[in-house]
């Protein structure tokens, strides 16, 4: 058993899986020195033969209906044992292709662990997969939170632009539909932020606190926007003189501090 792992490739050719090892096919190491020598033994090998010399960490990539365990590989028991439950690797590959990156990593870690952690290489790979799943998950959470924050900020800027314009008694004059678009733009961004927040999965404790704070800010902004939408609806239904009088009822306030 090698002390170091290396990568190889798999390809589906005309509906059949084959494996290729460019590393071993390119030469060999002897006495600490690499000798370049082409070896076609490791070119386009069927999975049943390849498993004799190559054991993937994740048994899915054995591409066998009766995958062998790590202990069986150690013991040289590489023949297909059809008394085992059949593993539909083709179906599992389809599932794998449709999984998120995090789910792929978690499923792979589960298979690695199930197949026996019997040496340091396997242990390190399992540790890597679990850490990578956790890191990728957290990166997704942070990315989504930042995306929601950006949408919220855009909404607040648009809202405050509208309020500033309203407090100037809608001067210089714009068409009603253009004024409506100003508040709709703010509402759209706040709603976008709310939708993104709802999609954030399994955040850690510190990020959850930030999410709750942002959610409250979004709810407050939504209430203010609804109030302005109602005011604008009344404004549009009035005549010129009546519209002007609405600006003297009370001055509208800017809202919120955009998130950094």
Question: Which residues fall in each region the model found?
Answer:
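Extended hydrophobic/Leu-rich segments
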Residues: 7, 51, 60, 73-74, ...
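Intrinsically disordered, low-complexity regions enriched in Ser/Pro/Gly/Gln/His and often acidic
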Residues: 10-12, 224
